[in-house]
Swiss-Prot record:
SUPFAM superfamilies cross-referenced by the UniProt entry: Urease metallochaperone UreE, C-terminal domain, Urease metallochaperone UreE, N-terminal domain
Taxonomic lineage: Bacteria, Pseudomonadati, Pseudomonadota, Gammaproteobacteria, Oceanospirillales
Gene Ontology molecular-function annotations: nickel cation binding; unfolded protein binding
Gene3D superfamilies hit by this protein: Urease metallochaperone UreE, N-terminal domain, UreE, C-terminal domain
Gene: ureE
Protein name, UniProt field: Urease accessory protein UreE
A Pfam cross-reference name: UreE_N
Key word Chaperone present: yes
Location(s), subcellular: Cytoplasm
Entry similarity comment: Belongs to the UreE family.
Chief site of localization: cytoplasm
Length: 176
């Protein structure tokens, strides 16, 4: 079994790759957020992913190993809800309400997309003003959500931790 251990991030190195050398791996988002797993190339050949923890794979990424095997990642089609709206303000409101529910979103000109959830579809349809322009389409399409403000590669992460205190500010200086 081929073991893939590294995502190539050097843009110069990526530009030098002969596309004919690339094998392909098609994965939905839920698989592209796992750094250690067994998967199959589109050719059917089994491979193991042993990537740095927290690595998010995006369509177009190239993986390699010590033997120089090159594998291009494709974002697989999966069941998604695509919200299409010609009114930019209404589409912004849709994105706001979905974001308030911490739903990973793919945001593009004219549409937003999320992993299909009929409850969220109904919520979007019931937003004030949605009946005038919002079209909820359940379809098979690649899903590439926004990375988020605190994430380098995107996806879902719990690596950033911080604490909050509700104590009143006070001085730590003492006069002795």
């Amino acid at each position: 079994m081929i073991e893939l251990t590294k995502k190539i991030t050097d843009t110069v190195a990526l530009e030098k790759i002969d596309p004919a050398r690339l094998k392909t791996l098609s994965l939905p988002l839920d698989a592209r957020i796992k750094s250690r797993q067994k998967v199959q190339l589109t050719s059917g050949e089994g491979v193991g992913l042993f990537l740095e923890r927290g690595t998010l794979l995006r369509g177009g990424d190239v993986l390699t190993n010590a033997d120089g095997v090159l594998v291009k990642v494709l974002a697989a089609n999966e069941t998604v809800s695509t919200i299409v709206c010609s009114d930019a303000l209404m589409l912004t409101k849709v994105a706001y309400h979905l974001g308030n529910r911490h739903v990973p979103l793919q945001i593009e000109t004219g549409f937003v997309r999320y992993q299909h959830d009929h409850v969220l579809d109904d919520m979007v349809r019931q937003l004030p003003g949605a009946d005038t322009c919002v079209d909820v389409q359940v379809e098979q399409a690649p899903f590439e959500p926004e990375a988020g403000a605190y994430q380098q590669g995107g996806g879902h992460s719990h690596g950033h931790a911080h604490s909050h205190s509700h104590e009143k500010p006070h001085s730590h200086t003492h006069n002795h």
